[in-house]
C-alpha cells in the first residue's frame, strides 16, 4: 500500500503547485530555464521520455528513483554546444551503499561567451565585458523499498548570474518508480524544481538619478537601484510508462512515453525507443513536445556504445544524441561514462 500512497501524494502535491490553464500558457514567466534542458544524452535521444526508465546515473535528472539500478558505481560527463553559442556541461556520480540506498552528486552549468557592455550613450561598448552563467549543484538519494518499488529525491542549490547581478535558491525533486506485474511494465512519476522564487540582485542594478531636474540647488544625484521581480522556478510534473517489446539475451527493444505538466507552458507528450544489441550497441529515437503549440523541438536520434574492459567488470559508455530545433537548427550532445 505504501507505493500507492507515495504515488498519490506525488500527484496531489504536483497539481496543487502547478497553476495552469488551457488558454494561458504562461510561457516566459519562470526563472532558471537551464533546469529544463535534458541532462543526459541517452534520455535526450529518446525524445526526453525517460521518467519510467530504470537508467542508473542517467535517471538522476529525469526521475531520481531510477538510480536504484546502479550496481556499484557510475559516473558520467556530458558536453553540449547549446543554441546561440551557449555551452552546457553536466557531470554526475552515483554510489551504491547496499542496504542504505544510493547516493549521487551532480553539477550542471550553462555559460555564454563574453560580450561588450553597451549603453545608450556608448552603443559600441564601454570597454567592459559581461557574461552569464547558470549553475546547479545537486545531492541525490534513492532507495528500493521493495523489489518492485523505488523512491528518490534530489536537493539542489541553484544560481544564476549576469554581469554584476545574481540570484540563488534551493530546490528539490521527488520521484517514484514502480515495476508492474504486467510484463514488467514500469510506471514512473517525478516532480522537479520545487523551491523558492529567484530574484536578481547586484551592483549592476544601481544607478544615479536627479529627482528634480527642473530645479537648481537641490540634491543633484541620488543613488538608486532598479527593483526586480521574483520569478518562480520551472516546476515540472512528469508521469511515464516504459517497457520492453523485445527482451532476449541478444536483442532488446524498449519503449517509453512521458506526459508532462509544467507551470510555465501547456502540457505535452514525449515518446522514445531504444534498441540494444548484445547490450553493447544502441540505437535510439524519439519525438519530443508532441501536441505543444509553437514548439521548435521534435525529432531526436542517438546511438551508444557500452564496452567492457577485458578481465574486469568496468564498462565504458559513450552516448551521442541529436535533437532537431527547427529555426534554431539542432543540438548535439556527447557523453562519456564509466560504471562497474
Segments the model singles out, each with a brief description of its role:
Residues 17-340:
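Subset of outer-membrane beta-barrel
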Residues 4-13:
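Sec-dependent N-terminal signal peptides
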Amino acid at each position: 500500500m505504501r507505493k500507492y500512497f507515495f504515488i498519490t501524494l506525488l500527484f496531489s502535491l504536483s497539481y496543487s503547485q502547478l497553476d495552469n490553464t488551457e488558454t494561458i500558457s504562461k510561457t516566459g514567466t519562470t526563472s532558471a530555464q537551464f533546469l529544463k534542458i535534458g541532462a543526459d544524452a541517452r534520455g535526450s535521444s529518446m525524445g526526453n521520455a525517460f521518467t519510467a526508465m530504470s537508467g542508473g546515473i542517467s535517471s538522476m535528472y529525469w526521475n531520481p528513483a531510477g538510480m536504484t539500478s546502479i550496481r556499484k558505481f557510475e559516473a558520467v560527463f556530458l558536453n553540449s554546444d547549446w543554441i546561440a553559442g551557449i555551452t552546457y556541461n553536466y557531470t554526475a556520480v552515483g554510489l551504491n551503499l547496499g542496504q542504505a540506498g544510493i547516493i549521487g552528486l551532480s553539477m550542471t552549468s550553462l555559460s555564454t561567451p563574453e560580450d561588450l557592455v553597451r549603453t545608450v550613450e556608448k552603443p559600441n561598448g564601454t570597454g567592459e565585458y559581461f557574461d552569464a552563467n547558470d549553475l546547479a549543484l545537486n545531492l541525490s538519494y534513492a532507495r528500493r523499498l521493495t523489489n518492485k518499488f523505488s523512491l528518490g529525491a534530489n536537493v539542489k542549490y541553484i544560481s544564476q548570474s549576469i554581469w554584476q547581478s545574481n540570484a540563488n535558491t534551493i530546490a528539490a525533486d521527488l520521484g517514484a518508480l514502480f515495476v508492474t506485474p504486467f510484463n514488467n511494465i514500469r510506471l514512473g512519476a517525478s516532480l522537479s524544481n520545487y523551491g523558492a522564487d529567484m530574484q536578481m540582485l547586484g551592483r549592476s542594478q544601481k544607478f544615479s538619478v536627479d529627482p528634480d531636474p527642473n530645479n537648481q540647488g537641490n540634491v543633484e544625484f541620488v543613488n538608486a537601484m532598479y527593483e526586480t521581480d521574483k520569478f518562480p522556478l520551472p516546476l515540472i510534473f512528469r508521469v511515464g510508462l516504459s517497457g520492453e517489446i523485445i527482451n532476449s539475451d541478444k536483442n532488446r527493444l524498449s519503449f517509453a512515453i512521458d506526459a508532462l505538466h509544467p507551470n510555465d507552458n501547456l502540457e505535452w507528450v514525449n515518446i522514445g525507443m531504444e534498441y540494444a544489441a548484445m547490450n553493447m550497441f544502441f540505437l535510439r529515437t524519439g519525438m519530443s513536445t508532441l501536441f505543444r503549440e509553437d514548439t521548435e523541438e521534435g525529432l531526436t536520434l542517438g546511438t551508444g556504445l557500452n564496452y567492457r574492459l577485458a578481465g574486469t567488470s568496468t564498462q565504458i559508455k559513450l552516448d551521442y544524441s541529436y535533437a532537431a530545433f527547427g529555426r534554431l537548427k539542432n543540438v548535439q550532445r556527447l557523453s562519456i561514462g564509466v560504471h562497474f
